[in-house]
Amino acid sequence: MKKYKRLLLMAGLVTLVFVLSACGTAPVSESSTGIWDRYIVYYFAQAIKFLSLGGSVGIGIILFTLVIRIILLPLMHFQTKSMRKTQELQPQLKALQQKYSSKDPETQRLFREEQQRLYAENNVNPYIGCLPLLVQLPIMMALYQAISRVPELKEGTFLWLSLDKPDPYLILPILAAVFTFASTYLSSMSQLETNASLKIMNYVMPAMIFFMGISLASSLSLYWVVSNAFQTGQTLLLNNPFKIRKEREEAARQAKARERALERAKSPKKKGKKK
């Protein structure tokens, strides 16, 4: 149940971003007041304009997104390591679930204490998986408002796109959904077990991105395409699921070979005793 609650929380947070994004509509400039408008949205816009090589706002958004992803790289790497540790603890967690299978409050309290102790001993935070999303939500909100509320960016174009309007050909929403699926699917491949909520997330998130992409500014779809393409490449480079699976298969093969060797070593002794 907790896994489904976490899934609903993440979906709700994404929706909340765009509800809040629509709240501010007044143009943002150097004379704007308020911490959000003056120091976040305004400076996001300035950064995008600075990176808009040749006056192309689209290039500015692409470069800005890459800079943000590079800054977040240590956090994402930490998240990946933490998730792998959590997966390695699954056999011990299952043993705890069997030990404290009763649903009475006292047993469940003991289970939670043992679970937290296991996490603490292995330096694992099971909620770290939500952290990158929580960090990126205000970035997406600020980017959306910078494009829609700063006149110089609002009038920007890129290739066939008017950046303050949805992509008329749906190319960016489709690419955003494809790269979102690729990044989430590759991440789930490296896990020992994929629970039901993660399987659902593999399809729910791309669908949400697509449907929001067909109705929101194409600047946001461009951000999603670049961000999730970067995430896909990062996963293949730093947490390659194909390599991890091969390593696990090799480790399992070696473990079985050691077991067979021990059995063969014990067999002559048993025969000798019979004589």
UniProtKB/Swiss-Prot annotation:
It comes from Enterococcus faecalis (strain ATCC 700802 / V583). It is a multi-pass membrane protein. Keywords: Cell membrane, Chaperone, Lipoprotein, Membrane, Palmitate, Protein transport, Signal, Transmembrane, Transmembrane helix, Transport. GO terms for cellular component: plasma membrane. Coiled coil: none annotated. Residues 1-22 form the signal peptide. PANTHER family: CYTOCHROME C OXIDASE ASSEMBLY PROTEIN COX18, MITOCHONDRIAL (PTHR12428:SF65), OXA1 (PTHR12428). Disulfide bonds: none annotated. Residues 249-275 are annotated as: Disordered. Residues 249-266 have a biased composition (Basic and acidic residues). A lipid is attached at C23 (N-palmitoyl cysteine). HAMAP family: YidC_type2. Required for the insertion and/or proper folding and/or complex formation of integral membrane proteins into the membrane. Involved in integration of membrane proteins that insert both dependently and independently of the Sec translocase complex, as well as at least some lipoproteins. The gene is yidC. GO terms for molecular function: membrane insertase activity. This is Membrane protein insertase YidC. The chain crosses the membrane at residues 53-73, 127-147, 169-189, 206-226.
